[in-house]
Amino acid sequence: MNGRRSFLRGFFAVLLSGGAIEGVMKLFPSKALAKEAARTGKWYGYGVSVDKCIGCARCMDACKNENNVPKEPFFVRTWVERYITRKNGETIVKAIAPGDEATPEAASDRTILRSYFVPKLCNQCANPPCVQVCPVGATFQTGDGVVLVNEKTCIGCRYCIQACPYGARYLHPKTHTADKCTFCYHRIAQGQLPACVEVCPTQARIFGDLNAAASPMSRFLRMNKIHTLKPGLNTEPKAFYANLDGEVR
């Protein structure tokens, strides 16, 4: 027993040393580097207050205009889903398009228990499967936690599109490369908000540095009961939801 205790003490002493941490990072580079970045610098996250979303689709319009996303409704970097839960337990989900009626559902329909909107986008995972499957390194994670795509090196193999559990990627019909939400990286690098956050009339969308205690994101996380999508997949998403129903996946 004493020998076992001595071994464990020695094991944990080595584990806590810098050399052991470096070894772990070599074995699990994407996850370890994400954790390291989260501790040392800016680490961007996104919040959605579901009860505030009115389904106006201004966010979708702003995103398309800002990022040259094709106008066709099936090409999106961010989208909004309408959820209708009926009293019999049935849940109906439909993605809305710009110009759709914003009212979740007629109040006169007595079969409806609840109707609401859920904005969705790339979850900017701390442990992103899309980065891990890219055979040429075109999909990568920045030091501040944003997953981007290098159009110059992307070969359009679609592996990342298939690997994304959130359905947040598509193949751009003109560039033939993978495309997705980037948190409007060109804007946030200059201290601006993502276009979708800036135009939201109800402040249902929130953005900020998770490591800054006074940032809108940090306040959002402190003041709400928070959920993430598909938490069991160990992707460590950085899109956080308040007032999210269990039906949402």
Language model feature labels by segment:
Residues 27, 32-36, 58-80, 127-153, ...:
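Iron-sulfur cluster-binding cysteine motifs and their immediate structural context
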Residues 106-107, 113-131, 238-249:
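Short flanking/linker segments adjacent to small metal-binding domains or redox-active Cys/His motifs
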Residues 176, 180-183:
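Catalytic cores of enzyme domains
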Residues 28-50, 64-124, 136-143, 147-151, ...:
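Sequence context of c-type cytochrome heme-c attachment sites
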Residues 195-249:
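Long, compositionally biased charged/polar accessory segments in the mid-to-C-terminal portions
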Residues 22-62, 232-234, 240-241, 246-249:
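C-terminal segment of N-terminal export signals and the immediately downstream linker at the start
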Residues 16-20:
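Intrinsically disordered, low-complexity regulatory domains of metazoan transcription factors
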Residues 1-15:
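N-terminal secretory signal peptides and thylakoid transit peptides that target proteins
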